[in-house]
Amino acid sequence: MAHESVWFSHPRNFGKGSRQCRVCSSHSGLIRKYDLNICRQCFRERASDIGFNKFR
């Protein structure tokens, strides 16, 4: 059994490893609310393009 076939052999159907940012493919800091699935860094860059407004 080669190393490549063992490395990602565990199914990732749930948990943090199953979800990633749709922009940069990062697993950390995901915003899942409203089915955004964008990490917080990418959200700050693209929030106004998506339609979010900052009140303050």
Curated annotation (Swiss-Prot):
Its cofactor is Zn(2+). Gene3D superfamilies: 30s Ribosomal Protein S14, Chain N. Keywords: Metal-binding, Ribonucleoprotein, Ribosomal protein, Zinc. The keyword Cytoplasm does not apply. Zn(2+) binds at residues 21, 24, 39, 42. The keyword Ribonucleoprotein applies. GO terms for molecular function: structural constituent of ribosome; zinc ion binding. Disulfide bonds: none annotated. PROSITE patterns: RIBOSOMAL_S14. InterPro entries: Ribosomal_uS14, Ribosomal_uS14_CS, RIbosomal_uS14_euk_arc, Ribosomal_uS14_sf. Binds 1 zinc ion per subunit. One of its GO terms (biological process) is cytoplasmic translation. GO terms for cellular component: cytosolic small ribosomal subunit. Belongs to the universal ribosomal protein uS14 family. This is Small ribosomal subunit protein uS14. It comes from Debaryomyces hansenii (strain ATCC 36239 / CBS 767 / BCRC 21394 / JCM 1990 / NBRC 0083 / IGC 2968). The lineage of its organism: Eukaryota, Fungi, Dikarya, Ascomycota, Saccharomycotina. The gene is RPS29.
